[in-house]
């Protein structure tokens, strides 16, 4: 039987360079990915390099709160 909360949680990854450029209004939008992570293996905030269609390059996408 499972104990406590679910181990796998759904998270949102957001492009960090689009968030910075959003202040200057240079970007057309903010790239976001939805994925899952294992809370026991990765207790800290997750950061992955993903493709951002608004920046047209691979950038760091960081985990955000819902």
UniProtKB/Swiss-Prot annotation:
GO cellular component labels: chloroplast; ribonucleoprotein complex; ribosome
Protein name as catalogued: Large ribosomal subunit protein bL33c
Annotated localization: Plastid, Chloroplast
GO molecular function annotations of the record: structural constituent of ribosome
InterPro entries reported in the protein's UniProt record: Ribosomal_bL33, Ribosomal_bL33_CS, Ribosomal_bL33_sf, Ribosomal_zn-bd
Family: Belongs to the bacterial ribosomal protein bL33 family.
Superkingdom of the source species: Eukaryota
Name of encoding gene: rpl33
Annotated GO biological process: translation
Main location (coarse class): plastid
Alphabetically ordered keywords of this record: Chloroplast, Plastid, Ribonucleoprotein, Ribosomal protein
Matching Pfam families: Ribosomal_L33 (PF00471)
């Amino acid at each position: 039987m499972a104990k406590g909360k679910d181990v796998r949680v759904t998270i949102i990854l957001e492009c960090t360079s689009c968030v910075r450029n959003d202040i200057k209004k240079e970007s057309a939008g903010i790239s976001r990915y939805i994925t899952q992570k294992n809370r026991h293996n990765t207790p800290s905030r997750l950061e992955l390099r993903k493709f951002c269609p608004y920046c047209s390059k691979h950038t760091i996408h960081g985990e955000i709160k819902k």
